[in-house]
């Protein structure tokens, strides 16, 4: 499992990724992510690329396409962008890349997530770094988005109605 972060605010996330079992983490503020991926994989690249960078623009998707060195690899994107100028369709075709769009979740995905939570396999308390009451929903949202006037270093916020 590889975990790549794109912003300096994500250093705490890199540490959590290590604790949750990531084999490698890449801080893109300190190293070239593609070069590091190629080093980790012995120049082979990855079989699957997951774009989990909501609102990050096109760069993470382009990185994923470049990192897919094996023909017939797969890339999973959130697809939040209304447009993608100069999308590298030729490279997708040449490499036989299949693109999957992940938006929302299914009933089965919720069941699997609940099973993971119940298994206590991962210390998920490391991921939920802050708890907010309902009166602080706006602050919670701004904090997760790292907005001005927000709480710093929030990886994930949980809303607790009784707080």
Residue ranges of model-derived segments:
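Adenosine-nucleotide cofactor-binding segment
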Residues: 1-63
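C-terminal hydrophobic helical "lid"/dimerization subdomain
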Residues: 31-32, 62-65, 107-163
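ADP-ribose/adenylate-binding Rossmann-like module
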Residues: 48-51, 68-84, 99-100
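A short acidic, amphipathic alpha-helical/loop segment
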Residues: 60-67, 88
């Amino acid at each position: 499992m590889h975990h790549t972060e794109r912003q300096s605010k994500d250093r705490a996330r890199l540490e959590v990724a290590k604790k949750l079992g990531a084999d490698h983490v890449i801080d893109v503020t300190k190293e070239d992510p593609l070069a590091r991926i190629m080093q980790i994989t012995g120049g082979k690249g990855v079989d699957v690329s997951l774009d989990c960078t909501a609102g990050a623009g096109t760069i993470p998707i382009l990185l994923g396409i470049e990192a897919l060195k094996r023909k017939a690899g797969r890339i999973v994107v959130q697809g939040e962008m209304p447009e993608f100028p100069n999308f590298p369709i030729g490279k997708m075709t040449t490499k036989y890349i299949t693109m999957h769009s992940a938006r929302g979740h299914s009933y089965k995905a919720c069941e699997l997530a609940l099973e993971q939570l119940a298994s206590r396999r991962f210390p998920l308390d490391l991921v939920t770094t802050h708890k907010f009451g309902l009166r602080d929903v706006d602050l919670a949202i701004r904090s997760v988005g790292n907005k001005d006037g927000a709480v710093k270093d929030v990886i994930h916020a949980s809303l607790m109605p009784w707080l």
